[in-house]
Amino acid sequence: MNTLFIHCRPGFEGEVCSEIADHAARLNVAGYAKAKPSTACAEFICTEDDGAQRLMQGLRFPELIFPRQWARGGFIDLPETDRISVILAYLANFPQCGSLWLEVVDTNDGKELSNFCKKFEAPLRKALTAAGKLVDDATKPRLLLTFKSGREVFVGLADAGNSAMWPMGIPRLKFPREAPSRSTLKLEEAWHHFIPRDQWDERLHGDMTGVDLGAAPGGWTWQLVNRGMLVTAVDNGPMAESLMDTGLVQHLMADGFTYKPRQPVDWMVCDIVEKPARNAALLETWIGEGHCREAVVNLKLPMRQRYAEVKRLLERIEEGFKARGIRVAIGCKQLYHDREEVTCHLRRLDLKKPKSA
């Protein structure tokens, strides 16, 4: 099991290779990363048998930026018939697993395999259970089978608590018909990723206030309003009338980069299309000067050196807060609903709850 297999957004294979190789070097795990363009996956081949396991144990999956899902294991070729026997034989030296996910890569070819996986899962699950390889136990490793085709599969393991929350790292979120744009799903997914579900009622509730910079037409504002917050929407463009009719939104025709609230708010969110360094500076200002306690801001990525640019900006933010003695939790992820961008979440850890704005 010396291969780490990683899912990602198509076109970002190089970023995954750069990121995982960076971490491997820091953890002294010898190996090399490889990927083909637009395949929605990458591999890190370890030179030592326990390398992939050490790499996974040394990293927290939610803190990785570009990987959507990962597993350690290896590829096997499958026959046209009786694939289950071949898989069972390969699993002979695997530990007993507590759950099973069948996955495909996020490409057109991968999606065509989805129906095959749905049909194949039930008989495979039955055979694994009968062989004593699969039980219902969340504390045991998850068995992940990623089908590259009907004849090739990556068979791997991942800890359920240190891997993606959803198969392939793709959330099953339903677009709310009332929301004025599909961008609303970006913010909802960000909350799922950065905020534990059992903390939503504490950190996303109706007594809170929020600011949406570059709000029009209101996709992100809708999420704040849906949690009952009073929202200041800052944009020179028009907001959806349905949002204004809620009575929870104040629309200010102003520049999102110059607006500052009169009183601190709980949340600031921003999805303005701008150079990433400028949006990162917004985070530094709003969190650093105490204008908000938590913030979600998207950073639009350059065409080249995308991982290097994100890493540089995150280090700048972290070092700046350390120098000022400000305690902040910093997270960054390329979400499924992100495109040429990543989503940053910052939470101020040394501020009391602001008074109502």
Swiss-Prot record:
Localization terms from the record: Cytoplasm
Residue ranges of coiled coil: none
Keyword tRNA processing among UniProt keywords: no
First-level EC class: transferase
Residues that, per the record, bind S-adenosyl-L-methionine: S183, A216, P217, G218, G219, D235, D255, D271
Similarity section: Belongs to the class I-like SAM-binding methyltransferase superfamily. RNA methyltransferase RlmE family. RlmM subfamily.
Protein name per Swiss-Prot or TrEMBL: Ribosomal RNA large subunit methyltransferase M
Organism: Pseudomonas fluorescens (strain ATCC BAA-477 / NRRL B-23932 / Pf-5)
